[in-house]
Curated annotation (Swiss-Prot):
This is Uncharacterized protein YesK. InterPro entries: YesK-like (IPR025434). The chain crosses the membrane at residues 11-33, 45-64, 68-90. Keywords: Cell membrane, Membrane, Transmembrane, Transmembrane helix. The keyword Transmembrane applies. It comes from Bacillus subtilis (strain 168). The gene is yesK.
Length: 100
């Protein structure tokens, strides 16, 4: 099976969209939780959980899956990690803006 440039570009767009969706979901859930539970600090736990899941996906792709499928799973893990970090930073920016 051969991959054309169009098919390879489709894979990258899926990975970028996954990272963006993860960031948006993290920021949205974080803002909603801050509105419902202003005393509790849960975004840090969500960030830690998503980073652990991303690292686990990368480890699993390296050890068990391997090959191109493993590379795609590893990229998905990186996107979850960076999406979670971006969502956390977006949440911090929103909270700073709301305080003003």
């Amino acid at each position: 099976m051969s991959f054309s440039k169009r098919e390879a570009g489709d894979v990258w767009s899926i990975l970028f969209v996954t990272g963006i969706v993860t960031a948006c979901l993290f920021a949205g859930v974080s803002v909603l939780m801050r509105m419902r539970f202003p005393d509790k600090s849960r975004p840090e736990w969500m960030l830690a959980g998503l980073i652990v899941l991303g690292v686990f996906a990368i480890w699993y792709s390296l050890v068990y899956v391997r090959g191109w499928e493993g590379a795609a799973l590893g990229m998905l893990g990186f996107n979850v990690i960076f999406g979670a970090i971006a969502g956390y930073l977006i949440d911090k920016a929103i909270r700073r803006y709301r305080k003003r």
